Amino acid sequence: MKNGLEHNTKLTPEARDKQIADIDKRIDEMAASDPWMKFFLAYAPAPTMRRVKTPVLILTGAHDQQAVPQEVPLMEAAFKEGGNKDVTARVLPDLNHLFVQDTDGFPQNYAKLPPPIMVRADVLEIIVDWLTKRLK
């Protein structure tokens, strides 16, 4: 949510700052009332990534607002720092979190995407090729 607002060019800076402040307040309220949410918000995945020794495929869309592409190099580095020698990372152009063609990737706009809403064929090819090479 917050990332989507921070990159939303349709809002004025004042409106964006107010909505971000409102989200921070809501997140704090959720964390205070829900133990799982508190854990989720505090969880840092890098130590776990460093312990993974199996092959890893990291895929995200360039317009993903949920697993932002800027974090891909950090994830890749964490896996490799732990000694993982088989880490593949790709940021796929023009796609959102669902691997669907999307101009901005904001989840609130998913319902407005024109049909057919399908994972692009090249994404499936990347996954199949990656698996085929490792499951011989």
Where are these regions (language model features)?
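Acidic beta-to-alpha connecting loop that harbors the catalytic carboxylate
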Residues: 62-64, 93-96
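Catalytic active-site module of serine/aspartate enzymes centered on a nucleophile-bearing elbow/loop
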Residues: 82, 95-99, 104-136
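Accessory cap/linker subdomain of secreted extracellular hydrolases
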Residues: 1-51
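Conserved beta-strand segments of alpha/beta enzyme cores
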Residues: 86-88
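Solvent-exposed, polar/charged alpha-helical surfaces in well-ordered, non-transmembrane soluble domains
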Residues: 47-50, 73, 77, 125, ...
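Short beta-strand/loop motif that positions the catalytic acidic residue
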Residues: 52, 58-60, 64
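Conserved alpha/beta-hydrolase "acid-adjacent" motif
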Residues: 65-74
